[in-house]
Amino acid sequence: MLMPYRRARYDILLLSLVSFSFFLLLQAAPVFPDPDSFYHTKIAMLMREQGIVKNFPWLQMTVLNSVFADQHLLYHLLLIPFLSLGLPPIWGVKLATAFFAWLAI
């Protein structure tokens, strides 16, 4: 018979595994549900290769044309380890999404 605190640990571990598996299942489609995901993926890949992105010339028709600011800098930094796992970029971001969702609970 397990002691109550050991039982609680197993329950937490089981809940963690089930919830992470559920979040992975939600990411199972081979597409991104939102087109912004491609932007975030590419910025994180550029940051991995070149460092902090200070110029982004592909935004000619936006207010960010003359002065680019990465409004999601920390998110892009958090994506870099997942994009460095050797998986295709789309799967690295999907794994990161499931991991961040799991951390939120």
Task: Indicate residue ranges for each PLM-predicted region.
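Start-transfer (signal-anchor) and selected internal transmembrane alpha helices
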Residues: 1-25
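Short hydrophobic/aromatic helix or loop-helix immediately within or flanking a transmembrane segment
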Residues: 62-88
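Transmembrane-helix motifs of polytopic, lipid-linked glycan transferases
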Residues: 95-105
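Mature N-terminal segment immediately following signal peptide/propeptide cleavage
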Residues: 42
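Extracytosolic helix-loop segments that constitute the early lumenal/periplasmic catalytic or substrate-binding loops
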Residues: 45-66, 74
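Helix-to-loop transition at the C-terminal end of transmembrane segments
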Residues: 24-39
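Membrane-interface starts of transmembrane alpha-helices
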Residues: 11-15, 88-96
